[in-house]
Amino acid sequence: MSTVAAAPRVLRNRRAPRPRRIRPARIALHAFLIAAVALWLFPLLWAIYAALRPVSETIINGYLSWPKTLNFNNFTTFWTEADLPYFYLNTLVIVVPAVILTLLLASMVAFCCTQFSWKFNLVVLMLFIAGNLLPPQVIIVPLYWVYLHTPIPSFGSIDVGRFSFALFSDNGLLYDQYIGIILIHVVFQTGFATFVLSNYMKTITKEITESALVDGANVLRIWWSVILPLCRPALAAMATLLFTFIYNDFFWALLLLKTGDKRPITSALSLLAGEFFVNNNLIAAGALLAAIPPIIVFIALQKHFVAGLTLGSTKG
């Protein structure tokens, strides 16, 4: 009985936990994060506000005024008059082959540099990574000259309605061609993809490769049937990043594609700007519609994207 009776006394004698003291450093950190989120959301919210507002009202009252009407006319106008589905298809013709070729080439280089010991593997890896340190603006003039003087054969075209995809080239040159813009993206994205995939492949033990060699598999079979399935999370994460990087490109498409009908959707937005008048409300609606595909890709590959970033950070 004494033991049972003593239990409530012990509970009554316990001290209540002290309230956590709010430190000034934590307050400053939260204030900084809130300010960063506000700065990031402001352009997006402003674009949504401008896209929902009629341009006539903006011209009369200015951008910094309370809206009288909000509607989706700018979205419907951009979808129909700017032929948005055509430029979506135009962009996918550039992005999808560029992502696939970049992943294949980068995974091959990363596989050779991490799973085999040879004399210059580190040098080769550093050369691919060093390509990302070169500003694209440095090579504009020589690259533009190369594109204007590189002959490319033509093997006909694939015509689907208004869309016409030339097999290699329709003018005999690398300039103003889908293949040219695809190649430049592959060249500039392979270094970063090689760096990420090589770090991930370092977590794969070399005993797996050696066992496959003993079983009679050649190097190409090991890369395709053994290494790539193990790197699926990293490949999905890399595919998401590459899709976003290439899809959002404005510089290379504006420089290397002369024909407006061949440009991707990001650089095609510049075609809406007139010589004497720019409908910023319509451009804001177009920019929001152009952002939909990367969001869909990220949501679809989000699970693999997060797994690829976390699994590649530890070894073993």
Language model features with spans:
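Short, Lys/Arg-rich, polar N-terminal cytosolic tail immediately upstream
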Residues: 1-22
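A structural signal for multi-pass alpha-helical bundles of membrane permease subunits
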Residues: 20, 25-316
